[in-house]
């Protein structure tokens, strides 16, 4: 089994408990992002918007497309901000284009530079 469905209340409780988390935890989240990039690349995903739409199915966020190169992720749980941001920093670290990721209150902005 590759995925688990987690109730939003559990998701919030998990991140409330984790708090800042250890460096090891965040390094692992980053590396999981890198690994997912390889997996999605092998599946043929190249377009940033399509990738964000695909990951949106996890219910981590609701995607707003601001422009062709700018996206806002409205988080389901604000406590998951660092988790989602760190995952995508790892994920897009393999991208040939520069991607800026900015955390804001209950949302994350992603911009292709």
PLM regions and their residue ranges:
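Arginine residue identity/basic-tract feature
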Residues: 12, 46, 89, 94-97, ...
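N-terminal accessory segment detector
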Residues: 1-67
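Beta-rich nucleic-acid/ligand-interaction surfaces
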Residues: 103-113
């Amino acid at each position: 089994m590759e995925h688990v469905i987690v109730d939003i209340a559990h998701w919030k409780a998990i991140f409330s408990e984790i708090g800042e988390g250890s460096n090891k935890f965040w390094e692992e989240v980053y590396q999981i992002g890198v690994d997912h990039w390889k997996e999605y690349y092998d599946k043929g995903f190249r377009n940033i918007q399509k990738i964000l739409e695909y990951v949106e199915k996890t219910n981590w966020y609701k995607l707003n497309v601001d422009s062709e190169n700018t996206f806002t992720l409205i988080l389901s749980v604000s406590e998951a901000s660092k988790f989602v941001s760190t995952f995508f920093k790892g994920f897009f670290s393999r991208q040939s284009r520069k991607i800026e990721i900015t955390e804001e209150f209950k949302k994350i902005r992603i911009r292709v530079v």
